[in-house]
């Protein structure tokens, strides 16, 4: 029984850590996206990026 409880504890810790990592990653992505949106809203994209994307 001890082995099972230890194993279950380990699994729960692993799942919990994965969830926390995913949550942090999601928050970082949202933060970056909001910052990017703010930047693009404040200033128009430079001409060279448009021309380079068109040439490719």
From Swiss-Prot:
Highest taxon listed in the record's lineage: Viruses
Assigned GO CC terms: membrane
Membrane protein topology class: Single-pass membrane protein
Transmembrane listed as a keyword: yes
Subcellular location per the Swiss-Prot or TrEMBL entry: Membrane
Primary localisation category: membrane
Transmembrane segments: 12-32
Induction: Expressed in the early phase of the viral replicative cycle.
Name the UniProt record assigns to this protein: Uncharacterized membrane protein pNG6
């Amino acid at each position: 029984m001890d082995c099972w409880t230890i194993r279950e504890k380990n699994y729960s810790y692993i799942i919990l850590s994965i969830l926390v990592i995913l949550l942090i990653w999601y928050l970082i992505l949202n933060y970056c996206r909001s910052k990017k949106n703010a930047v693009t809203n404040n200033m128009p994209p430079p001409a060279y990026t448009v021309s380079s994307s068109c040439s490719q």
